[in-house]
Curated annotation (Swiss-Prot):
One of its GO terms (cellular component) is membrane. The gene is PROT1. This is Proline transporter 1. One of its GO terms (biological process) is amino acid transmembrane transport. The keyword Membrane applies. The lineage of its organism: Eukaryota, Viridiplantae, Streptophyta, Embryophyta, Tracheophyta. GO terms for molecular function: amino acid transmembrane transporter activity. It holds the Pfam family Aa_trans. Its main location: membrane. PANTHER family: OS05G0424000 PROTEIN-RELATED. Expressed in roots, leaf blades and sheaths, stems and young panicle.
Length: 473
């Protein structure tokens, strides 16, 4: 072992010992105990104290090529959520608003994510978690707030994905036996169980590998089937109604909710965690992955969203495959592909929580497939997904969850925080014009976030009064 390796081992040992509780005497003479986590570099907090940023992780980092990360991002963009964008984006906004909104949302999302990617190595080190980056720039309070926002974001995305998987299973059942015996909550419970089985076997994000290829195949299958069958239905049904439904007040709230859905469509809320897996040079490679996502990777989203709205107009179902007509076996293949792709996509969005649980509470010994590590995943990840599944079954309002996710977390994480962090770090190198531009983004998206949250809560309240807990929708 050379001197460099010895130094690294000594640093790891120092980090391990620093995680033990430390004691000190307070002003009143009583002993105060403070637990210092496994951390490695320091940052200033609000009181000019020091807070440390973690580099310790139970998952693999810095090993993936840019195109694998590009496929991870594309998998998120083209998840089964795309089957709902005709209804959740185009119906409330119409042709002009929906088309311009999708293009504009893609542009501003690409810009905001590029800003975030350029902050990955602030301070001469990699920040492998969003909360670590926020903590390094702002301090301990923002570290905790960012983690809370991100947790809400990913929890609601995963809840929506489990609802989608349940809808796909129910759609398959209805194709063969439309007797009302198998309810949506049962399908959601079964979907959560399958997602848990997948989570037990895939230890970390980088281990997806071949599954990303399969995810792409599944996405292309259900998108192509939905596209072709919608095209056929649109040709055979020339009379279509594109009128934006609802009263004047309803349209205001649904329009705001649709704006939240626009930003939800393109953003993960976990870019630093995804960037952590990429090989150096991390900024350059991440830019390649982002360009892939927002060009080639977004084409399927546009195709199925526009075609679904063109074919069915304002009567488009919130799950497009419920609107299409055609042979049972083709619709079965499409729904099964949507179900399987959703299982893989959920693992991507759940990976930051898995990483936190594995790093914080895992044994840290043995390989990822050692019996004790597998049993740990069964207990911890199984418990997390059980809560996700319960919420999904209780409130299966998919479009509302998309709006609320965009409002509460996608806007703050991707647009407000990214612009303000970039402004804070680079302000000495910026012109007055650029500073004003970033402040405009911060204030504007903050206002949109509040408005979208109000609209989403109203939509959920309306749906809750119309339906009931564990509704069979």
């Amino acid at each position: 072992m050379d001197q460099h390796q010895l130094d690294e081992e000594n640093q790891r040992a120092a980090l391990f010992h620093s995680s033990a509780p430390s004691s000190s005497l307070g002003a009143d003479g009583e002993e105060e105990r403070e637990t210092v986590p496994l951390l490695s570099c320091k940052m200033a907090d609000d009181k000019s104290d020091t807070v440390q940023v973690s580099e310790d992780t139970a998952h693999q980092i810095s090993i993936d090529p840019w195109y694998q990360v590009g496929f991870i991002l594309t998998t998120g963009v083209n998840s089964a959520y795309v089957l709902g964008y005709s209804a959740s984006i185009m119906v409330p906004l119409g042709w002009i608003g929906g088309t311009c909104g999708l293009i504009l949302a893609a542009a501003i999302s690409m810009y905001a994510n590029a800003l975030l990617a350029h902050l990955h190595e602030v301070g001469g080190k990699r920040h492998i978690r969003y909360r670590d980056l926020a903590g390094h720039i702002y301090g301990r309070k923002m570290y905790s707030l960012t983690w809370a926002l991100q947790y809400v974001n990913l929890f609601m995305i995963n809840t929506g994905l489990i609802i989608l998987a349940g809808q796909a299973l129910k759609a398959i059942y209805v194709l063969f036996r439309d007797d009302g015996v198998l309810k949506l909550p049962y399908c959601i419970a079964l979907s959560g169980f399958v997602c848990a089985l997948f989570a037990f076997g895939i230890p970390y994000l980088s281990a997806l590998r071949i599954w990303l290829g399969l995810s792409t195949v599944f996405s292309l299958i259900y998108i192509m089937i939905a596209f072709v069958m919608s095209l056929r239905d649109g040709i055979t049904t020339p009379a279509k109604d594109y009128t934006i439904p609802g009263s004047h007040s309803d349209r205001i709230f649904t329009t705001i909710g649709a704006v939240a859905n626009l930003v939800f469509a393109y953003n993960t809320g976990m870019l630093p965690e995804i960037q952590a897996t990429i090989r150096p040079p991390v900024v350059k490679n991440m830019e390649k992955a982002l360009w892939f996502q927002f060009t080639v990777g977004s084409l399927p989203l546009y195709a199925v969203t526009f075609m679904g709205y063109w074919a069915y107009g304002s009567s488009t179902s919130s799950y497009l495959l419920n609107s299409v007509k055609g042979p049972i076996w083709i619709k079965t293949v499409a729904n099964l592909s949507a179900f399987l792709q959703t299982v893989i996509a959920l693992h991507i969005f759940a990976s930051p929580m898995y990483e936190f649980l594995d790093t914080r509470f895992g044994s840290g010994h043995g390989g990822p497939f050692a019996i004790h590590n597998i049993m740990f995943r069964v207990g911890v990840r199984g418990g997390y997904l059980t809560v996700n599944t319960l919420v999904a079954a209780m409130l299966p309002f998919l479009g509302d969850f998309m709006s609320l996710t965009g409002a509460l977390s996608t806007f703050p994480l991707t647009f407000v925080l990214a612009n303000h962090m970039y402004l804070t770090v680079k302000q000495n190198k910026m012109s007055i014009f650029r500073k004003c531009w970033h402040w405009l983004n911060v204030v504007g998206f903050s206002c949109l976030s509040v408005a979208a949250a109000v609209a989403a809560v109203r939509l959920i309240t309306v749906d809750y009064s119309t339906y009931h807990l564990f509704a069979d929708m």
